């Protein structure tokens, strides 16, 4: 197993009340959708997707991310990676559907696809206006449709509701998505209705990040999210029984959505 690259935090951006972006002093050659293992000395190591070549956006959801949010500019972290599969463009028109912190890997894909001349529509969702991420970046490289659960900005409702509206008006060659797994399961179902290929970024509890420990294996195929994913094609998801239903915690216990 490779050693982490020691990086210094040169900037911390408060993206929302619960999300911070940590910009480090080294660039990484990653592909959109890939992740790295971030190491906090004396704490632990956890997986996070890239939000740019030298940054990671972290939502405060548990003890590790709480420690991350306590870091200051100038502090040290370790970065091991990049690892995993990534979003691959096909065709000339792509629909991107992002929810919550899932906007982080999606923005990297949208920016990369845009450089290749692909026309992109992004549906970006969050619970409230304050929790919407990367609005300026999405607007620069895609046609942006915004959804909030409470109606504080844009369309009031779920991204999947807006997705149905968009698909009634336009045709797309590919759909990519990242966000809450229940949302992504619905995205896949809608994509299948329209016979559009779809790529999904899954999240699972990980330890090694390279497919050795088996901590992130999913039922029934035994696929490792860290190595066979995190980005899966929709046709492979039919064989992952737990997708959209449950995940496992560190002890292996099922946590139902």
Curated annotation (Swiss-Prot):
**Alphabetized UniProt keyword annotations:** 2Fe-2S, Electron transport, FAD, Flavoprotein, Iron, Iron-sulfur, Metal-binding, Pyrimidine biosynthesis, Transport
The cofactor required is:
[2Fe-2S] cluster; FAD
Q: What InterPro entries has UniProt attached to this entry?
A: Cyt_c3_hydrogenase_gsu, Dihydroorotate_DH_ele_sf, Dihydroorotate_DH_Fe-S-bd, Dihydroorotate_DHASE_ETsu, FAD-bd_FR_type, FNR_nucleotide-bd, OxRdtase_FAD/NAD-bd, PyrK_electron_transfer
Query: Cross-referenced SUPFAM superfamilies, in alphabetical order?
Result: Ferredoxin reductase-like, C-terminal NADP-linked domain (SSF52343), Riboflavin synthase domain-like (SSF63380)
Per the entry, the cofactor note is: Binds 1 [2Fe-2S] cluster per subunit.
A single Gene Ontology MF term assigned here is:
2 iron, 2 sulfur cluster binding
Q: Which cysteines are joined by disulfide bonds?
A: none
Domain annotation FAD-binding FR-type: ranges:
2-89
Alphabetically, which GO biological process terms does the record hold?
'de novo' UMP biosynthetic process
Please give the pathway this protein is involved in. Answer: Pyrimidine metabolism; UMP biosynthesis via de novo pathway; orotate from (S)-dihydroorotate (NAD(+) route): step 1/1
Signal peptide positions on this chain: none
| Positions that bind [2Fe-2S] cluster | 208, 213, 216, 226
Q: What does this protein do?
A: Responsible for channeling the electrons from the oxidation of dihydroorotate from the FMN redox center in the PyrD type B subunit to the ultimate electron acceptor NAD(+).
Q: Tell me its family.
A: Belongs to the PyrK family.
Which HAMAP family does the UniProt entry name for this protein?
DHODB_Fe_S_bind (MF_01211)
Per UniProt, subunit arrangement is: Heterotetramer of 2 PyrK and 2 PyrD type B subunits.
Protein name per UniProt: Probable dihydroorotate dehydrogenase B (NAD(+)), electron transfer subunit
Q: Could you tell me which species this protein originates from? A: Methanocaldococcus jannaschii (strain ATCC 43067 / DSM 2661 / JAL-1 / JCM 10045 / NBRC 100440)
The organism's taxonomic lineage, starting at the top: Archaea, Methanobacteriati, Methanobacteriota, Methanomada group, Methanococci
Gene field: pyrK
